[in-house]
Design a protein with these regions (language model features):
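Residue-level detector of conserved catalytic or cofactor/ligand-binding positions
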Residues: 221-229
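Residues forming the flavin
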Residues: 93, 218-220
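Secondary-structure junction/capping motif
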Residues: 20-23, 208, 227
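Generic signature of intrinsically disordered, low-complexity segments enriched in small/polar residues
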Residues: 125, 196, 200, 228-229
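N-terminal glycine/serine-rich phosphate-binding loop of ATP-dependent small-molecule kinases
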Residues: 1-183, 190-193
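Active-site phosphate-binding/coordination module
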Residues: 190-218
Length: 229
């Protein structure tokens, strides 16, 4: 069954007893396994087991994110919040960045916003930016910071429009050409321009959103337009 890259599952669990003293963690993992889902816990999710499980009498919703190899429990909420399931879909363009807020329960686009890519401060065309940061890691990090600033502005616009905060969004899929994804990851993109054109990375896949500096609890899936610079 294809569940996408995130899912939310409501679990009505039996609280621990002396006869069944399994941990809160194992109760959740066992219940997920009964649904055909093998998962592991992230540390932030483990830290939310108490007091949420006790206060909700073990009627909880778990948020799961696919990390490329296994489902990870990334959040816990009291009660049934399975319908409140959101994701971002982003187009990271060299001039304009577009982000859509998606209801992952039914695929509905709830809102869309666009912004000029703040990278343009380092050149209106890609080549100027590539040369600006060649062998200059501090400039490369500045360009990456401009990218993140653009996303932050877009997330805030979407929050104002829908009331849904970035911290309530599980994951993001971002597509862009090879250079834009290199900038997003903080990788020097000069290899895109110079022979033999062997890029630093072209199968990035899933990376933890927090490690990238994003507020989402799950992962960011980066998709590169291989045919473009």
């Amino acid at each position: 069954m294809n569940r996408g890259i995130t899912q939310k599952q409501y679990l009505g669990l039996v609280p621990p007893t002396e006869e069944d003293a399994r941990s809160s963690q194992m109760r959740i993992l066992d219940a997920l396994k009964e649904k055909g889902i093998t998962a592991s816990f992230t540390l932030p999710a483990l830290q939310k087991l108490y007091p949420i499980c006790d206060e909700a009498d073990y009627n909880i919703t778990v948020s799961l994110a696919w990390n490329g190899s296994i489902w990870q429990v990334v959040d816990l909420e009291a009660g049934d919040t399975a319908a409140e399931h959101y994701g971002y879909a982003a187009d990271l363009g060299s001039t304009t960045v577009v982000v859509r807020l998606v209801n992952c329960s039914d695929g509905t686009v709830l809102a869309e916003e666009s912004e000029y890519n703040r990278q343009t401060a380092y050149g209106t065309d890609i080549l100027t930016r590539i040369f600006a940061c060649k062998d200059k890691p501090e400039v490369l990090q500045d360009i990456r910071a401009c990218t993140m600033e653009t996303f932050t502005l877009l997330f805030e616009k979407l929050r104002q429009k829908t009331g849904i905060a970035p911290s309530d969004v599980l994951s993001m899929v971002v597509s862009g050409n090879t250079t834009m994804i290199h900038f997003l990851l903080g990788l020097d993109p000069f290899c895109v321009f110079s022979s033999p054109y062997a890029v630093r990375a072209d199968r990035v896949g899933f990376l933890p959103a927090k490690e990238m500096g994003f507020p989402m609890k799950g992962c960011v899936l980066s998709l590169i337009h291989i045919s473009e610079p």
